[in-house]
Amino acid sequence: FKPSEVINYGTAGAIKKGLTGIVECTKFYQRDMDVRSLLDLKLGETPFDNINEIINSDDGYLCGSGDSFVNKQIEMKVDLVDMEAYALAKVCILEGIKFRCFKYISDNADSDASSDWIENCKKGAELFQIKIKDF
């Protein structure tokens, strides 16, 4: 089985001020890969990997994926942060599958992020159920 398209929905923390609601991400970066002190690579670049950024379109938002919950300002210049979109987008590129990504802005990636996330998950799911009817 190979799907023709993968649609990812999840929550994200806003880095860009004023970002709210459900947004579509079209550019994906690995925000916590950092070997700059060891190799001549940029933040987000993985050694021996030729895919370091994924750009599906110039429209949409920049998403930085990582393994940690963000509760303070980060160094990478992205609009929002999550924990899975980069990996999903990369698998889709490698397998030749169309990828779309929608994120509900659940928090502002600050010190209140974890409590805001819990409160906003249900609201985001309800809004995405409405949005998916437009596909």
What are these regions (language model features)?
Residues F1-F135:
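Glycine-rich phosphate- or other oxyanion-binding loops that anchor nucleotides, phosphorylated ligands
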